[in-house]
Regions:
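Histidine-acidic metal/acid-base catalytic patches
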Residues: 1-2, 9-21, 49, 79-91, ...
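N-terminal small/glycine-rich loop or linker at the start of catalytic domains
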Residues: 1-3, 56-65
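Short, well-structured secondary-structure segments
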Residues: 26-33, 54-59, 93-94
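Glycine-rich, proline-tolerant flexible connector loops at the mouths of alpha/beta enzymes
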Residues: 29-50
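The substrate-binding groove and active-site-proximal loops of carbohydrate-active enzymes
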Residues: 31, 63-64, 68-71, 99, ...
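Short active-site-proximal "capping" loops at secondary-structure junctions
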Residues: 33-38, 61-65, 247
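Glycine-rich anion/phosphate-binding loops
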Residues: 39-40, 68-80, 103-108
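Short, structured patches in soluble enzyme cores that scaffold and shape functional sites
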Residues: 97, 126-130
Length: 285
């Protein structure tokens, strides 16, 4: 079970390694974004060595807030992400479908993904996203509206050709359970469509709000436990990674508790085990 460095924001990348070591996570998914340390492979390698936590995956800098990280060319950024994963010993790169305005990138995206996988020992796992919903402007009642409509209602996709990567078809996928909530997508059905190509799970939850929530699994309406059990039953051998929002945690202890709950959920439903309840503070420098 891995921990996304995004899960500790507004704390930094080093803090994510520290939490992972303390709580007993197996590894890290590195979110490459504006923080300089996240962009520096030598720095990340030093964290991995110091805390004894390996890097499982690299999340390419493809968010709206990271459009200028590692340059402005998304083609070059994806290639650099794959090379970074290789250098860090990670076997997976997580990437979003191209934005609609990235026309050249979008036209060649599927071909580039295939070529990168053919020439590097890294899986490029394309992540399911969600549409921009009209009720984003009216957050009150958004969850009830989604339930009533059995879908997101009036919405527009910012992604080309779709926010659902199975509409295009790739060899490898990332399934995000917060994104399925916002999109009104059946997570189990999406997992079945992804099939053996599902190699990476962002374990989170959501209630169907118009915005992306990334709740602790079990705190929303997504079939998190059922999906984990489905993965066990189908022989899933990829990475499950906690990608939750802890911005509202007022203290490190509160943030640690949220991360520990997520790890306990994963251990229970993916392995039938529970983590050591005593963080390993004494082992850290």
């Amino acid at each position: 079970m891995g921990l996304s460095t995004a899960s500790v924001y507004p704390e930094n990348t080093q803090a994510a390694f520290r939490y992972a070591a303390e709580l007993g996570y197996d590894g890290i998914e590195l979110m490459v974004w504006a923080e300089p340390a996240s962009q520096n492979i030598d720095t990340v390698q030093s964290y991995a060595k110091r805390y004894g936590v390996r890097v499982l995956a690299v999340h390419a800098p493809c968010l709206l807030i990271s459009q200028r990280v590692w340059g402005a060319d998304p083609v070059a950024k994806l290639e650099r992400s794959v090379r970074a994963a290789e250098a860090l010993g990670a076997d997976t790169v997580v990437v979003h479908p191209p934005f609609r305005w990235q026309r050249r990138y979008a036209r060649g995206f599927a071909e580039q993904v295939g070529e990168l996988e053919a020439h590097h020992p890294v899986k490029v796992a394309v992540e399911n996203m969600f549409p921009m919903r009209a009720d984003t402007l009216f957050r009150e009642g958004a969850v009830r509206r989604l339930e009533r409509r059995a879908g997101p209602g009036r919405a527009v996709s910012a992604f080309s050709p779709s926010y659902d990567p199975t509409d295009t078809g790739f060899d490898h996928y990332t399934l995000d359970l917060s994104h399925t909530a916002t999109a009104g997508t059946d997570a189990l059905e999406l997992a079945r469509r992804m099939g053996e190509g599902l190699v990476h799970l962002h374990l989170a939850d959501g209630r169907g709000a118009a915005h992306d929530e990334h709740l602790v699994p079990g705190d929303g309406t997504q079939p998190c436990a059922q999906l984990c059990e489905y993965l066990v039953d189908t022989g899933f051998r990829g990475h499950a990674v906690a990608e939750i929002n802890t911005q509202n945690a007022r203290t490190t202890a509160a943030r640690s508790a949220l991360l520990a709950r997520t790890l306990e959920f994963a251990r229970r439903h993916l392995t039938g085990a529970t983590p050591d309840p005593q963080p390993r503070h004494a082992d850290l420098p």
